[in-house]
């Protein structure tokens, strides 16, 4: 009986080790699937609109200014009342300048806030170069990667909420991979159509010790004009109504 029990215990241990090894492999293999799920959530399967209120620190002229975000597919149209207009895609950012669409300058910001236009791009896995999981715990899955294309950043560290399939925190490193430039936190998520959208975005700059807070009120927008998602649309007034 002692030998039988010992053999059984040995098989149990081996089975547990095999299960743990399989779990580790599954976690490693699931990164691509997780990023695809995050991209699916970030994408606007149906058009949506956010009425945005900007709050920023001393010296920031944009504080109190309303803005509008309109999303469709992988495109985000951005308009700041009385000023900036932009069409943001993962691989291209256009702004209205001189009555036509022009490439955004590297590092161009949302008004004069701590938020770069590229920070607002709809997430796709293609924007990350060799992403790796650096932590996986109750606070979320931490994915570290360099940007794959042209970017103002040297390194991005994203924390992903597995349940919502949404990025809830980002660390942005500029110039060098150990030079933290700013942090972003997304909160107050609401379900809009098939996706989770943040009701609050807070960006804090480490270098300037400044902070920008965006409050977003999302809703579905099935009647959004197609022209706003075309470069030519930046050459004419949007015709959007303001709250």
For each predicted feature, which ranges?
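Bacterial N-terminal signal peptides
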Residues: 13-21
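Short solvent-exposed loop/turn micro-motifs enriched in small/polar/acidic residues
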Residues: 59-62, 79-80, 126, 151-153, ...
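Bacterial N-terminal signal peptides that target proteins for export
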Residues: 2-13
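N-terminal mature ectodomain segment of secretory-pathway/periplasmic proteins
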Residues: 29-98
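Sec/Tat signal peptide C-region and signal peptidase I cleavage site
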Residues: 24-28
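Short amphipathic beta-strand/extended segments with alternating polar/hydrophobic composition
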Residues: 63-67, 87-91, 101-108, 157, ...
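Flexible, processing/modification-adjacent segments and terminal tails
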Residues: 29-35, 43-44, 84, 88-156, ...
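Gly/Pro-enriched, hydrophobic low-complexity segments
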Residues: 136-230
